[in-house]
C-alpha cells in the first residue's frame, strides 16, 4: 500500500516522524509536509507564487506552502502513482468540533479525499504532549484495517486520540462533531516600536460535548473517529430560503 503522509505542524514536527515510522509497518510511506508550522491554514492553496519542493536529510519532502498545497502537489505533480491513502498528522492538539473548519491537519486529509483518495486526519488531544506513539499506532491500526476491509468509495475520517498510553485507550468510537463556544477575543498588544498588534484568541470551550460527540468520546478515554463530508449545503433550509426568495 502506498501512503502519502502530511501535516500542518511542519516536516520537522515529532508527530509526523512518529506517524511515518508507524505507517512503514503497513505500507510504502512518502512524506510531503510544509517547511514551517502552518496550523489553522485550513484548505488554502497558494496561487500568488510558485511552490518549491525540497528533500530533507531524513528523506522527508517539504514545501514552502500550506498543507493543502503539499497534498495537491504530491498527488498531481510529484508521485508516479495515485496513493492508496493519505494520512495527515499527528497533530499537536485536538481537532474536534469547529476546529475542523480551520485545521490544516484536516485540510491535508480533505485534499486527498477531494482527489479521490481515502484519507485520515489524526490528532493527539494535548498541547503539552511529547509522546505521539499511541496516536501513531492508532493511525497504523486504521491503515491496516483499510488494507483488510477497504471502503467501496473514498472516505474522510477525522480521528482524535486521548493523551494516554496505547494500552490505556478504551477503544474506537464513531462520533459526530461537537461544537465549541465562540473563540476568545483577539488580544491587543503594543510592540517596542509602539505599533499596535493583535493575537488571535484561544478557541472556545466545548458548547456541545453531549451524547455521540467527539468531545465526549475523548473525555471518556475513547479514540474518536468522525466521518466527514465536503458538501456544505444546508438542505433543511432550502425550502425556507426558496420561499423567502420568492416573496
Swiss-Prot record:
Q: Which UniProt keywords apply?
A: Cytoplasm, Hydrolase, Metal-binding, Nucleotide-binding
The membrane spanning regions, by residue number, are none
Tell me, what is one Gene Ontology molecular-function annotation carried by this entry? exopolyphosphatase activity
> What catalytic reaction does the record list?
a ribonucleoside 5'-phosphate + H2O = a ribonucleoside + phosphate
Q: What class of enzyme is it?
A: hydrolase
- Binding residues for a divalent metal cation: 8-9, 39, 91
EC number(s) per UniProt? 3.1.3.5
Cellular component annotations (GO), alphabetically ordered: cytoplasm
Kindly list the places in or outside the cell where this protein is found, as annotated in its UniProt entry.
Cytoplasm
Which cofactors does this protein require? a divalent metal cation
Q: How is the cofactor bound?
A: Binds 1 divalent metal cation per subunit.
Keyword Hydrolase tagged: yes
What family name appears in the similarity comment? Belongs to the SurE nucleotidase family.
HAMAP family with a match to the protein in the record:
SurE
Q: What does this protein do?
A: Nucleotidase that shows phosphatase activity on nucleoside 5'-monophosphates.
The record ties this protein, via PANTHER family, to: 5'-NUCLEOTIDASE SURE, 5'_3'-NUCLEOTIDASE SURE
Q: What is this protein called?
A: 5'-nucleotidase SurE
Source organism: Aromatoleum aromaticum (strain DSM 19018 / LMG 30748 / EbN1)
- Whichever gene encodes this chain, its name is surE
